[in-house]
Amino acid sequence: MPKPPDYSELSDSLTLAVGTGRFSGPLHRAWRMMNFRQRMGWIGVGLYLLASAAAFYYVFEISETYNRLALEHIQQHPEEPLEGTTWTHSLKAQLLSLPFWVWTVIFLVPYLQMFLFLYSCTRADPKTVGYCIIPICLAVICNRHQAFVKASNQISRLQLIDT
């Protein structure tokens, strides 16, 4: 019968805490069972969420320039356009006056589409990758509807034989 190791020394306790270099546990087993596409999908989801958190932090905490421009725009009274105004200034004024829900839709729909695509890459079945993207989803739904109509037309053409 093998003798249990004595972890009284520092290096042995470090080996106990860190391990022998091989990971074990349910997370490691789940990672080993995934194929390459699924692993890259999970890494992509993690990096996408990390980049999203950094972008949200930048927009809402660090970017003083946008806050200053938005406050200046709110404090201004509507004036007649000046003769020296360029098209970029007028475009910026029009974009800053858009309501919050428009900006939310403009940024949230592509953001969610990209997230759902990366999340679909984590699925085990490669045929289901990308079904959550709106154009692909609409194409699949229309294709299924056309197949259903075609099948129902073929069934209605069959004659019942009374015996």
UniProtKB/Swiss-Prot annotation:
List the membrane topology term(s).
Multi-pass membrane protein
Which Pfam families does the entry link to? TMEM251
Which keywords does UniProt give here? Disease variant, Dwarfism, Golgi apparatus, Host-virus interaction, Membrane, Transmembrane, Transmembrane helix
GO process terms (BP): lysosomal transport; lysosome organization; regulation of vesicle-mediated transport
* Physiological role: Required for mannose-6-phosphate-dependent trafficking of lysosomal enzymes. LYSET bridges GlcNAc-1-phosphate transferase (GNPTAB), to the membrane-bound transcription factor site-1 protease (MBTPS1), thus allowing proteolytic activation of the GNPTAB. GNPTAB is involved in the regulation of M6P-dependent Golgi-to-lysosome trafficking of lysosomal enzymes. LYSET is thus an essential factor for maturation and delivery of lysosomal hydrolases.
Q: Which family does it belong to?
A: Belongs to the LYSET family.
Associated disorder is:
Dysostosis multiplex, Ain-Naz type: An autosomal recessive, severe skeletal disease characterized by features of dysostosis multiplex, severe short stature, coarse facies with broad nose and prominent lips, protruding abdomens, and progressive skeletal changes causing gradual mobility loss. Death in childhood or early adulthood may occur.
What protein name applies here?
Lysosomal enzyme trafficking factor
